[in-house]
């Protein structure tokens, strides 16, 4: 056996020290303590931030939501079946970001911005944070430009302005999604970009919506964000924020955008599930204490921003333009109960609500808008001039009709004035009916409202109101195309337009059939 003298031993040690690779990487790493139901508990992450992305082996990511004294609770974004106790978990120092930009228009993406429509990668897109602070009061501008939904009942009585938050609320299966989709279809030539966020819906339902948007030429102008019912609660919770970030891209660059959240009830349920699994204390209806903040921080991001904000954001690249993000959140009620926890929260956050009623829907009045309890708190200032002028008596007529109709059931004989009011109300109710996927232009709508407001429907049978309206619009678009184009472009109402519409309707009634 070879003997080593002390000098050789010291030389070997020196050589090893000289050749030692001492380059080290400082990182914050912990150990997975438990994995269950999409929730991971991690021990040993010292400097983790709230909402920070956490990396697990195999390219799986999570999001830190509970920062406790000796552990961190995180939700896994995606499949968690590969994770096991004892695995390492690393902090990334980043918060969740999603792709943004015009490359997303016409595409269907998941809650993390990955394309799921089979049309290939998105291309060169920027990314932006999912959680952002809403613009401050100083940077905002008042709402004074309209978003035309194409629905007579909405644009006449409950107008929506650019930068407004207008809630669509009602029971299941009474046309909430149909109304929102029609509003998106009506924007295809308006220059407003659209984002449709589907939360907790069946994939077949979403596929049908995408097909309808494509058939009506509106998909090229729309981003569809999907967190279906089969996906994790974490993705259903994040999808509205991801969609909002994609919409803010347009707002911050001086463009106008419209976002539909379908629906926030399912997002609240997903957040409740996450919170209960994270062992947070439950409150009313088992929702966590911050469920109001869940929706308020999302809906406050919908706003109209000033020219100065856009100029500052784009570093002077865009000047003299305001930007807006208009939100149409949808809430599903149970048996018409708007006093439940989530509906009351969202009603108090938004700038008005469109209330859809089951009884009206079942009696064939579609869209089933209850004009009495629906309201738009800021949209009046944004309403098109001609629609504002002609719609004044419509809401009153409907409100009086509903009141008198209930009274008339018990009264045997009615005086002449009451009978006329009832008949006028019936005709206006019939006129407010509208087919799905058939949004109306400003001129078409003005024509219908003019006929109702100026008494041209008095001698038309109630059963024939719909066919009268269709024939009238077709006649004007054929024989008075110049007048219709003028109304559509300017939206003004003056003596010349008044006289033109009046003469046209009189001639139509004298010469045409319906």
UniProtKB/Swiss-Prot annotation:
Give the main location. membrane
Q: Where in the cell is it found?
A: Cell inner membrane
* Membrane topology per record: Peripheral membrane protein
What EC number(s) has UniProt assigned to this enzyme?
7.1.2.2
Keyword annotations from UniProtKB, A to Z: ATP synthesis, ATP-binding, Cell inner membrane, Cell membrane, CF(1), Hydrogen ion transport, Ion transport, Membrane, Nucleotide-binding, Translocase, Transport
MF (Gene Ontology): ADP binding; ATP binding; proton-transporting ATP synthase activity, rotational mechanism
- Which EC class is this protein assigned? translocase
* Keyword Membrane tagged: yes
Annotated residues that bind ATP are located at 170-177
Q: Quote the InterPro entries the UniProt record gives.
A: ATP_synth_asu-like_sf, ATP_synth_asu_C, ATP_synth_asu_C_sf, ATP_synth_F1_a_nt-bd_dom, ATP_synth_F1_asu, ATPase_a/bsu_AS, ATPase_F1/V1/A1_a/bsu_N, ATPase_F1/V1/A1_a/bsu_N_sf
Any one Pfam family match given in the protein's UniProt record, by short name = ATP-synt_ab_C
- One GO CC term, this protein: plasma membrane
Q: Where is this site: Required for activity?
A: 374
Q: Which reaction does it catalyse?
A: ATP + H2O + 4 H(+)(in) = ADP + phosphate + 5 H(+)(out)
State the family it belongs to. Answer: Belongs to the ATPase alpha/beta chains family.
| HAMAP family, per database record | ATP_synth_alpha_bact
Summary of the function given for this chain in its UniProt record:
Produces ATP from ADP in the presence of a proton gradient across the membrane. The alpha chain is a regulatory subunit.
- Describe, as the record does, how this protein assembles with itself and its partners: F-type ATPases have 2 components, CF(1) - the catalytic core - and CF(0) - the membrane proton channel. CF(1) has five subunits: alpha(3), beta(3), gamma(1), delta(1), epsilon(1). CF(0) has three main subunits: a(1), b(2) and c(9-12). The alpha and beta chains form an alternating ring which encloses part of the gamma chain. CF(1) is attached to CF(0) by a central stalk formed by the gamma and epsilon chains, while a peripheral stalk is formed by the delta and b chains.
Q: What is this protein called?
A: ATP synthase subunit alpha
Q: What is the scientific name of the source organism?
A: Pseudomonas putida (strain W619)
Q: Which gene encodes it?
A: atpA
């Amino acid at each position: 056996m070879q003997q080593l003298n002390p000098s050789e031993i010291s030389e070997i040690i020196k050589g090893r020290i000289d050749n030692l690779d001492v380059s080290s990487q400082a990182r914050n790493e912990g150990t997975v303590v438990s994995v269950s139901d999409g929730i991971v508990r991690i021990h040993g992450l010292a400097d983790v931030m709230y909402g920070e992305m956490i990396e697990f082996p195999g390219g799986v990511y999570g999001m830190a939501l509970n920062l406790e004294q000796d552990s961190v609770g995180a939700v896994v974004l995606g499949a968690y079946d590969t994770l096991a106790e004892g695995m390492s978990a690393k902090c990334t120092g980043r918060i969740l970001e999603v792709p943004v930009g015009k490359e997303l228009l016409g595409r269907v993406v998941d809650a993390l911005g990955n394309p799921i429509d089979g049309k290939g990668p998105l291309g060169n897109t920027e990314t932006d944070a999912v959680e952002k602070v809403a613009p401050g009061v100083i940077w905002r501008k008042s709402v004074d430009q309209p978003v035309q939904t194409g629905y007579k009942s909405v644009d006449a009585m409950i107008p929506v302005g650019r930068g407004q938050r207008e809630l669509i609320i009602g029971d299941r299966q009474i046309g909430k999604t149909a109304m929102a989709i029609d509003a998106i279809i009506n924007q295809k030539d308006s220059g407003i970009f659209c984002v449709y966020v589907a939360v907790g819906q069946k994939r077949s339902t979403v596929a049908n919506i995408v097909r309808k948007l494509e058939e009506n030429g509106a998909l090229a102008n729309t981003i569809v964000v999907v967190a279906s019912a089969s996906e994790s609660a974490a993705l259903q919770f994040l999808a509205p924020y991801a969609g909002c970030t994609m919409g803010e891209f347009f707002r911050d660059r001086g463009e106008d955008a419209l976002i539909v959240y379908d629906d926030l009830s399912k997002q609240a349920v997903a957040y409740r599930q996450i919170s209960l699994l994270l062992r947070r204390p439950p409150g009313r209806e088992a929702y966590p204490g911050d469920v109001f903040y869940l929706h308020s921080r999302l809906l406050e991001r919908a706003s109209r921003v000033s020219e100065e904000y856009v100029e500052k954001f784009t570093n002077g690249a865009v000047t003299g333009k305001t930007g807006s993000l208009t939100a149409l959140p949808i809430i599903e009620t149970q048996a018409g109960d708007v006093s439940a926890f989530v509906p009351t929260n969202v009603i108090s956050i938004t700038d008005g609500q469109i209330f859809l009623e089951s009884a009206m829907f079942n009696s064939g009045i579609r869209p089933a808008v209850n004009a009495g309890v629906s309201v738009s708190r800021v949209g009046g200032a944004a309403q098109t001039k001609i629609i504002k002028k002609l719609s004044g008596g419509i809401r009153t007529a409907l409100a009086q009709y509903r009141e008198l109709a209930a009274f008339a059931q018990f009264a045997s004989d009615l005086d002449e004035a009451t009978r006329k009011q009832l008949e006028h109300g019936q005709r206006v109710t019939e006129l407010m009916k509208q087919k799905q996927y058939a949004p109306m232009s400003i001129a078409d709508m003005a024509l219908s409202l003019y006929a109702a407001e100026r008494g041209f429907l008095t001698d038309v049978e109630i059963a024939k109101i719909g066919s009268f309206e269709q024939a009238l619009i077709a006649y004007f678009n054929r024989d008075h195309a110049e007048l219709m184009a003028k109304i559509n472009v300017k939206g003004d109402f003056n003596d010349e337009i008044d006289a033109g519409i009046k003469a046209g309707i009189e001639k139509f009634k004298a010469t045409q059939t319906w």
